[in-house]
């Protein structure tokens, strides 16, 4: 079943959301970031540093704290056991972690690309 944090989020996220960006990140975890900071803003910083565009980025996610990143990256995968709203945010799905889903996708990329980096 869903963890306690997910069940209780309606009680505390509205009270704190004006000060920080809160997102359920697992059964018992809650990400608390400064407003305007997310996995996507971190990835955007790295893209800028390396001169990459969103179309040159692939990301993987499994929880609510990944949605913005999944929506904006050129290629995005949600693991198949993620929540429905996370899967809807990604362009693709991959098998769950216990089936090495991320590794399966990365192996496919590496086989298809002569210079992946």
Which residues are covered by each model-predicted region?
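Short glycine/serine/threonine-biased micro-segments
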Residues: 1, 59, 76, 99
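Conserved acidic, metal-coordinating active-site core of Asp-based
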Residues: 3-60, 64-69, 81
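Hydrophobic/aromatic beta-strand patches that form the interior of the parallel beta-sheet core
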Residues: 58-60, 77, 92-94
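Asp-based, Mg2+/Mn2+-dependent phosphohydrolase catalytic module
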Residues: 72, 80-117
